[in-house]
Amino acid sequence: MQAKAILRHTPTSPRKMRLVAGLVRGKAVDQAKAILLNSTKAASRNALQTLKSAVANYAQLNPDERVGDQELFVKSVFVDEGATLKRMLPAPMGRAYRVRKRSNHLTIIVDKVKNPETK
């Protein structure tokens, strides 16, 4: 059974968030958390928060299972474009440049590993 978490209206451009999403796609949850904690990207903080929420949602949906981070993996991560706020920046000769402040929606889906590796 899978669980998902959605973070909406994040004030980061979707392009920057997709770079972070690509780092953790398909990884084990404990490995993904380590990657996000050590990442220098600002968007990784929001991605880590959403990943922790997805793991908590999995535990909430499956109360009779005790599942650790090493038994879960990031099944899919996708970033959708959110609302774009249009602002004006004063420019020379009485003109104005348009500034687009972009946002995104981050969705993380976690699932249990089918055949856990024994170490």
From Swiss-Prot:
Keywords: Ribonucleoprotein, Ribosomal protein, RNA-binding, rRNA-binding. GO terms for cellular component: cytosolic large ribosomal subunit. Pfam families: Ribosomal_L22 (PF00237). One of its GO terms (biological process) is translation. It comes from the Bacteria. GO terms for molecular function: rRNA binding; structural constituent of ribosome. CDD domains: Ribosomal_L22 (cd00336). Belongs to the universal ribosomal protein uL22 family. This protein binds specifically to 23S rRNA; its binding is stimulated by other ribosomal proteins, e.g. L4, L17, and L20. It is important during the early stages of 50S assembly. It makes multiple contacts with different domains of the 23S rRNA in the assembled 50S subunit and ribosome. Part of the 50S ribosomal subunit. NCBIfam families: rplV_bact (TIGR01044). This is Large ribosomal subunit protein uL22. It comes from Chlorobium luteolum (strain DSM 273 / BCRC 81028 / 2530).
